[in-house]
Amino acid sequence: MAEITVGQLAQQTNKEVSTLLKQLKSFGIEKSSEKDTLTPEEMKTLLDKINSAKNTVTRKKVTSLKLDGKHKINVSVKKKRRVAKKVEEQSPAKVEESIVEKPQAAVDVKDNKAVESVERNSVNLVQPQQEKPVTKPVIKDNGFKITAMPEVKIQENNSQDEEKSSEDKSTESKNNKKKSPKKVFTESGNNTNTKYKREEEEKKSKAKKASGKGFKKANPRQLSQLAGDLESFDEFGSKKGKLKAPKVKKQEFTMPVESAVKTIEIREGITVSDLANRMAVKGAEIVKVLFNMGVMATINQSLDQDTAVLIVEEMGHKYTLHNENALEEAVTTVDRSLHKKISRAPVVTIMGHVDHGKTSLLDYIRKARVVAGEAGGITQHIGAYSVKTSKGAITFLDTPGHEAFTSMRARGAKSTDIVILVVAADDGVMPQTEEAIQHAKAAGVPIVVAVNKIDKPDADPDKVVGELAQRNVIPESWGGDVMFANVSAKTGEGVAELLDAVLLQSEVLELEAFAEGLAEGVVIESRLEKGRGPVATVLVQNGSLKQGDNILCGTEYGRVRAMHDDLGKQIKVAGPATPVEILGLSGVPAAGDDMVVIENEKKAKELAAQRSQRQKEAKIAQEQSLKLSNMFSNMGKEGEQQTLKIILKGDVQGSVEAIRESLLKLSTDEVKVDIIASGIGAITSSDVTLAVASTAVIIGFNVRADSAAKKLAEVDGVELRYYNIIYDLIDDVKKAMTGLLSPDMKEQIIGIAEVREVYRSSKFGSIAGCMVVEGAVKRTNPIRVLRDNVVIYEGTLESLKRFKDDASEVKKGMECGIGVKNYNDVREGDQIEVFEVIEVAKEL
């Protein structure tokens, strides 16, 4: 506690210096002037003296109880109370002024810390005061209270003070019981009552003078304490106990709490409700923020990460972006540091235009009749084959050449090391040839050109070389880096040179792979077979795939139950650059998905579910964007767009994907193709039920409907169509779309009549006497009136007569009378043109 002068203490307590010096002298502290300083020991002595100055006051209270009749009983209760004794007598006016006046500003001390303000409190004159330690911040006196210095850290404890005061009350009440009688019976009750009233009036007047201006209303805490000391008696004078004082609610002040700043983890595609739950706010608040940002959203709508980040920052929280690929990177990353690389066989993809002899060339190399098994001689899906030659093994991928199989060609180019571009010597470069060149260059794969069908009389290999050179495929003989080989798939001419070129190119590439460790690869093709389940053709690229391994292919997972090579033989292990068929997946994977072996089946299942959920969210987001784009594209268009709904079932994933893309490309502004469902396997009853509900046509490509589905289709009238060749399927769909088109209305002139003379008729008005100069005039057809080759009226005929007889038709070179309905301004020299409206079918 720092030292303080007498003048500073007098200024803070609003006392005169002389008065304060007298009080200090009465407490044994000798000070002569206002400049004298008070040491901490003297301040402590002053506070102790103030707290010890107490006095005990006994108060007597008499109450009157009524009995039966006119009898009364006077009850006298005495109560003691300890009251702080005044240091000196002061006038009431001064007391009131000291209560109202507010303390002055705090006085600076040596340590530059403000001394807390000192206030006077008259309540201390009435209420008993407990002795408090020096460390308390507030110590009450008769006329003032002194706050502690700032360097002493003290916290006031109200609850302890209340407990002490309650203990004092209990001790006082016990003393009252011992010293004063409980009941006093007297006959002179009236005299006692008048005496009691005088005492009460004197006490009230004293209390009013002492209370001051700031305490006109009674303190609830004082009332409750007084009520607790009163004892109640029944009508017979027996004690009932103390009256219960009502509980006084204390007004508490709650400090304002800062809003908690949370760190929100944001994943891609998070919904509005999920984001609201993570921020512990209502979903409507998020919707409001989005609305202010100009985005109309519902509580179940998905948000992209950027929008969610803006919302979190707007609401004052922090964020962390969730790494969607964390689990995938941890599971699919294979440690190859302990494994050694070995040379592997090249993976060669045969590409080119349709019917240029790709599969026939591969057939000659494999010495097997593959083309005979393909419908129409057209490759419907990728075939993966491993061929052993005298100079080494080669893995071949045969891709379709039809334009519908663009994605399959791109997939083949991505999975390959070398591309054999087959070009027919008689056809030259065709559209799919150019597309194959683009796929190979995009994948960065070297090209070996095979000029096929050189055995034909009209073959012109030099023409092919020139056309390819125009497309930046330069042969080595011209100074380029592309090897050319003239071959004949029918006779086998030049096939050996082609294989030598492929093996030479593979040596230049120095192809290597890891033969050990967990296998990695790519799905070439997949299908659903009856009795075997999902079957996937997989090309192993690294490691060894073994029977019993846990694999993950896209969104599907499973254990390898069986493996077969390209010849159909069951094998146990497949090394790099080996195509195999595997069984045991949970579903049919998409062609082009990566295949990876995972040691933990639980993690494989979890990752597959995560990929499936991500795919579903992406699909929903795409549908929402498509709906919005369709809404804007359809604005201002008249009429409704016709829709051809199709349910597509196929034998393999690649064919279904290719047909789906081809059919969707047929959509126009007037007719739209909608593939409402597609899948692999036979047509089932559920497909027929879906077709009935959606009024769709079922198309099967290399699949048939089972017996139950056939019966249900006959009953419900659902159309089933089967195809083996993609050309026929696309042509029939085009015809069906043409049938849905609304026909064009075309006007055709069938006759012209010249007005030679005009007659007046009371019945029909003006009658034109005409000569038919072209075609024929028919009674029921619409007409136009032309004057100087300008249409002045369009309507119908009211009458057509040949002489006096009605006629339905008047041919060229004959005269007739024509009455035009609702038109009388026909003049000589006008022409009456007769026409008819015919429907013309639209074409796609």
Curated annotation (Swiss-Prot):
Q: Where in the cell is it found?
A: Cytoplasm
Q: What is its main location?
A: cytoplasm
Named from the GO MF annotations, one term is: GTP binding
Region G5, annotated ranges:
488-490
| TM annotation in the entry | none
Q: Locate the region G4.
A: 452-455
Q: Which InterPro entries match?
A: DNA-bd_dom_put_sf (IPR009061), EF-G-like_DII (IPR053905), IF2_II (IPR044145), IF2_N (IPR006847), P-loop_NTPase (IPR027417), Small_GTP-bd (IPR005225), T_Tr_GTP-bd_dom (IPR000795), TF_IF2_bacterial-like (IPR000178)
Q: Which residues bind GTP?
A: 352-359, 398-402, 452-455
Please give the name of this protein: Translation initiation factor IF-2
Q: Which organism is the protein's source? A: Francisella philomiragia subsp. philomiragia (strain ATCC 25017 / CCUG 19701 / FSC 153 / O#319-036)
Write the gene name.
Answer: infB
